[in-house]
Amino acid sequence: MIYKYLGNNTLKNIKIIHIVGPNNFDNSKKFENYKQIEFIKDMTDFYSSIDLQVSRAGGGVLEAVLINIPLLLIPYKHGTTSTHQSMNAEYLVKSKFAKLCSNYESLEYEFKKLEQLDNSLFEEFSKNNVIKIGNDFIVNKIIDEINKWVIKIFIF
């Protein structure tokens, strides 16, 4: 799908890194602002080099959320992964970490905004709105649950 936009110069002002997966590298796809990568070994370096991630809405988007990279999500609509991808996308959009692109027209609209260097897309995201995850959060949730039970035990 990305080739459609590269071929008609829609995204000439944007550098694109396309992770294509093992054995999917295509030497015929040559564009000045486009680079294919089969696999990323160091995700820290990769994430520090991007401003926006366009991807499906599987579990892999959580790393981007954790380090506040805005997302354009295109949930997979077929098969067994469709339900969790829709749920992930819905939650991330509601939390202002992502924008949902449910069809090619909505994705093209966002690409055109980016091409015009329209930063409103980034302003829509809560850059400092970190989802509460990680060990400290989990430990505190467990302690809260234990405290609820301890209080219930002493009340009865």
Each predicted region: which residue ranges?
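Nucleotide-activated sugar donor-binding and catalytic core shared by glycosyltransferases
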Residues: 1-156
